[in-house]
Amino acid sequence: MKLIVGLGNPGEKYAQTRHNVGWLVVDELARRAGGSWRKDGEAEVCEVRLGTAPGEKVLLVKPQTFMNTSGKAVWPLMSFYKLEGEQLLVVQDDLDSPFGLLRFRLGGRHGGQNGVRDIIARLGYDRFPRLKIGISRPPAGRDPADWVLSKWRDEERETLAELVRLGVGAAELWAVQGLAEAQQMYNGTDLRPQPPAPPAAPAPAADGAPGDAQD
């Protein structure tokens, strides 16, 4: 058994906010696997099998405690199933990565993400994988707390849908083949618009072309 935890806040008003991108990933994982959600303590959970049949047994988790106390939902499940840190993947939003970036990280500090902060505090260790999905820092003068609870703009939705699709593939690869394979495949993901290439330099004129000086 492995756990894939999508971080977010419960309630319709939070469903399409930046902070809930982790929920979008686990919801899509559940949909593709044909699973159904049920209540289990402080979480909604969905048991699925990922990968080639018979597949890897995975419990998808959506904490129902609100973001800042996510560990309250995660710790009992880790304890009940007697899981270690490497069997847990947390899918989270990441303020410090530009929107369009997706990457795995093993362990380390919470980086200001309060759901991760609480999971670390309740588990008593930080050595578990995270799948970090960039949402960018807010525009100058805007409070980060307000930014993470803001809804996606219409012009961001195409990139968001692709990030979620890639996040699903990344989480499934982690579950089936492990962190190293998933990092190698997905840590270069960058969906940011690329600047246009500079115009090519004009080719040098051939000898004897019009305008050349002649002997």
Swiss-Prot record:
One annotated GO molecular function: tRNA binding
Extent of Pro residues compositional bias: 193-202
A Pfam match: Pept_tRNA_hydro
Biased amino acid composition, Low complexity: 203-215
SUPFAM superfamilies: Peptidyl-tRNA hydrolase-like
Cysteine-cysteine disulfides: none
Protein name per UniProt: Peptidyl-tRNA hydrolase
Native species: Deinococcus radiodurans (strain ATCC 13939 / DSM 20539 / JCM 16871 / CCUG 27074 / LMG 4051 / NBRC 15346 / NCIMB 9279 / VKM B-1422 / R1)
The organism's taxonomic lineage, starting at the top: Bacteria, Thermotogati, Deinococcota, Deinococci, Deinococcales
